[in-house]
Amino acid sequence: MYNETPIKRRPSTRIYVGNVPIGDGAPIAVQSMTNTKTTDVEATVAQIRALEKVGADIVRVSVPTMDAAEAFKLIKQSVSVPLVADIHFDYRIALKVAEYGVDCLRINPGNIGNEERIRSVVECARDKNIPIRIGVNGGSLEKDLMDKYKEPTPEALLESAMRHVDILDRLNFDQFKVSVKASDVFLAVESYRLLAKQIRQPLHLGITEAGGARAGAVKSAVGLGMLLAEGIGDTLRISLAADPVEEIKVGFDILKSLRIRSRGINFIACPSCSRQEFDVISTVNELERRLEDVTTAMDVSIIGCVVNGPGEALVSHIGLTGGHRKSGYYDEGERQKERFDNDNLVDSLEAKIRAKASQMANRIQVKDTTE
């Protein structure tokens, strides 16, 4: 498949969230956030494990109270994925979760308090080698900035971010990343563009409060796609009013679409029409469901007829082209003698895809050990 990419990543410094490298050319990390009550340790741990299962690199957990901080201690002991503590209003909560091994602290400049409080958080983070995310949000800008700009603007978000970047600079603390999120695509995109020109720290991308599963995914894909295509962004979170697991899936789909980072199967499927020789939609849906556990990056084309089928199969790892009663099967662009019965496509394709994924994974492993 044609995969030449003109995308040149923005140069940035390197930090680590747990064992996950961020910035300086590291793979763009995909993260989500739990939506359980943090004090419900069992439910929160279960959700974090579900996120880890679908590929989450980092998980953020809201810690609104000291009781939640105590719960965070137990949660941290129960999972292996790096955790970010989301802190608002009370800086003392940040100090407490730092004692419990948090991997990153997210603080909101709009409500964390004065510079002295920030200094306390920074000194604690420095002592324990914990990075910080300065998380600016268009919905919670500082009052003086709202008075100055009257509404959230790219300049307002930038000023909020930079005043806190300056504080960290004065404190000689450089282990941080920054985000300037907004629910409006154009506001967020322009804010990130301005910020990218001002600093070299890693940038965490997101369209905040993007909406439900469908609309939020589209809005995030448009906004983040614009930034990623310009080389901006080192981590991302898709904010959906939906199961957090969907955020991880959409995040990887966006990166996969831009050929930035691939995980799992990239299904190339026609929308179907009266020429289809089998039910394309149900076939693809069932294969997606069955093959969610496959992490090997591969392209699979499933086309219902011979108009575009052979051409798509030519540039896929595995291809299927609809035919009368039996459909043609391709491996690495080569037409195979084997044909699949249209009434048993899903089982046949699942077996072939799993075998191919295993073969490709072994090939990568051998290559890595010989280099």
Curated annotation (Swiss-Prot):
The record's GO molecular-function terms, alphabetically, read: 4 iron, 4 sulfur cluster binding; 4-hydroxy-3-methylbut-2-en-1-yl diphosphate synthase activity (ferredoxin); 4-hydroxy-3-methylbut-2-enyl-diphosphate synthase activity (flavodoxin); iron ion binding
What sort of enzyme, by top EC class, is this?
Answer: oxidoreductase
Pfam families attached here?
GcpE
The protein's annotated catalytic reaction(s) are: (2E)-4-hydroxy-3-methylbut-2-enyl diphosphate + oxidized [flavodoxin] + H2O + 2 H(+) = 2-C-methyl-D-erythritol 2,4-cyclic diphosphate + reduced [flavodoxin]
- Write down the required cofactor(s): [4Fe-4S] cluster
Q: Where does [4Fe-4S] cluster bind?
A: 270, 273, 305, 312
InterPro entries per the UniProt record, alphabetical: Dihydropteroate_synth-like_sf (IPR011005), IspG_bac (IPR016425), IspG_bac-typ (IPR004588), NO2/SO3_Rdtase_4Fe4S_sf (IPR045854)
Query: Is Nucleus one of the keywords UniProt gives this record?
Result: no
- Pathway noted in the entry: Isoprenoid biosynthesis; isopentenyl diphosphate biosynthesis via DXP pathway; isopentenyl diphosphate from 1-deoxy-D-xylulose 5-phosphate: step 5/6
What binding details are noted for the cofactor?
A: Binds 1 [4Fe-4S] cluster.
Family affiliation = Belongs to the IspG family.
What species is given as this protein's source? Answer: Shewanella oneidensis (strain ATCC 700550 / JCM 31522 / CIP 106686 / LMG 19005 / NCIMB 14063 / MR-1)
* UniProt function note: Converts 2C-methyl-D-erythritol 2,4-cyclodiphosphate (ME-2,4cPP) into 1-hydroxy-2-methyl-2-(E)-butenyl 4-diphosphate.
Please name the GO terms of the biological process aspect recorded for this protein, alphabetically. isopentenyl diphosphate biosynthetic process, methylerythritol 4-phosphate pathway; terpenoid biosynthetic process
| This protein's encoding gene | ispG
Annotated EC: 1.17.7.3
Q: Does the keyword Membrane apply?
A: no
Q: Could you tell me what this protein is called?
A: 4-hydroxy-3-methylbut-2-en-1-yl diphosphate synthase (flavodoxin)
The entry's keywords: 4Fe-4S, Iron, Iron-sulfur, Isoprene biosynthesis, Metal-binding, Oxidoreductase
Lineage in the entry? Bacteria, Pseudomonadati, Pseudomonadota, Gammaproteobacteria, Alteromonadales
